[in-house]
């Protein structure tokens, strides 16, 4: 007899990566719940997202991180809690942790991670402080004895591949004439399509192999340097791009001189594409790799992703 699939609550489900996780959960056959603030329903864009959730059979629960009672009530209905709250709310996840402790029924908590392994990064400010909040949440989860999985996903394909990592507002497709490469362009980065990140993450929620572990989503075809990504694109369009290298010293200077949120983005880009912070070895005592655990998931390679734009 097949094991019954867990009931999943997504907090922050109308956000960027949250939408993909809600959809993946519902499509994988989990009873899926999304905690939504009343104010979200009046937002025309997010209101449409909520309706799309309902069309998938998702149960919409009304609540708020600042309403402890609503959190506990929502959490008591599920087995797994996935948080996808944004960067400004990372530390507010202590409220989710408190509600999980009071509810007493949660088998797994996945806090808002979905990026680098924050315990193993050499990021400069302001990314360093942003990651520090996630580290604090990890330590709180562990201290409270809450069962967890940390989803370390590398970069979102939708953030980086349509622009070839170019920081140009308004750019919606890869450049066909010139490109700026960060540093020497040789540091390898992990980049995954959002739907694949969600599929792997949902697979992990009921898997004992991922309990109290870090789930690294690092399929072999999706770990490439910026130089390699540019070369793939050049082959697809049949021409060479004019390349300009931005030295690390200049990037660090730009980070210091840029306003929020540009400095945050640039410091993350420095961590990923100059330091190579997403391309780390996996320590088996606390980490597992998603594509090895779930070879049945047909992921989109970076090469295939770029073909959408060629």
Curated annotation (Swiss-Prot):
Pfam families: NmrA. Its EC number is 1.3.1.-. Gene3D superfamilies: NAD(P)-binding Rossmann-like Domain, UDP-galactose 4-epimerase, domain 1. InterPro entries: NAD(P)-bd_dom_sf, NmrA-like, NmrA-type/Isoflavone_red_sf, PCBER-like. The keyword Signal does not apply. The keyword Oxidoreductase applies. It is found in: Cytoplasm. Belongs to the NmrA-type oxidoreductase family. Isoflavone reductase subfamily. This is Isoflavone reductase homolog P3. It comes from Arabidopsis thaliana (Mouse-ear cress). The lineage of its organism: Eukaryota, Viridiplantae, Streptophyta, Embryophyta, Tracheophyta.
């Amino acid at each position: 007899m097949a094991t019954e699939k867990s009931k999943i609550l997504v907090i922050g489900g109308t956000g960027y990566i949250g939408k993909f996780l809600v959809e993946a959960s519902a499509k994988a056959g989990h009873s899926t719940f999304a905690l939504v603030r009343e104010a979200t329903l009046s937002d025309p864009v997010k209101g449409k997202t909520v309706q799309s959730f309902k069309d998938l059979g998702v149960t919409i629960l009304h609540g708020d991180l600042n309403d402890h009672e609503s959190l506990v009530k929502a959490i008591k209905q599920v087995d797994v809690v996935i948080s996808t709250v944004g960067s400004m709310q990372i530390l507010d996840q202590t409220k989710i942790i408190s509600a999980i402790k009071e509810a007493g029924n949660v088998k797994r908590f996945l806090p808002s991670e979905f990026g680098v392994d924050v315990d193993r990064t050499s990021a400069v400010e302001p990314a360093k402080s942003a990651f520090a909040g996630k580290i604090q949440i990890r330590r709180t989860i562990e201290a409270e004895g809450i069962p967890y999985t940390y989803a370390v996903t590398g970069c979102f394909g939708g953030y980086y591949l349509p622009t070839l990592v170019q920081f140009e507002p308004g750019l919606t497709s890869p450049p066909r004439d010139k490109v700026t490469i960060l540093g020497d362009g040789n540091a390898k980065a992990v980049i995954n399509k959002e739907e694949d990140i969600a599929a792997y993450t949902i697979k992990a929620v009921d898997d004992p192999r991922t309990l109290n572990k870090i789930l690294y989503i690092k399929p072999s075809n999706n770990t490439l340097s910026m130089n390699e990504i540019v070369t793939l694109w050049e082959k697809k369009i049949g021409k060479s791009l004019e390349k300009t290298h931005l030295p690390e010293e200049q990037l660090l200077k730009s980070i210091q001189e840029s306003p929020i949120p540009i400095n945050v983005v640039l410091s993350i880009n420095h961590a990923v594409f100059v330091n190579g912070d997403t391309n780390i070895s996996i320590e088996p005592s606390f980490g597992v790799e998603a594509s090895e655990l779930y070879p049945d998931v047909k992921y989109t390679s970076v090469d295939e992703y770029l073909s959408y734009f060629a």
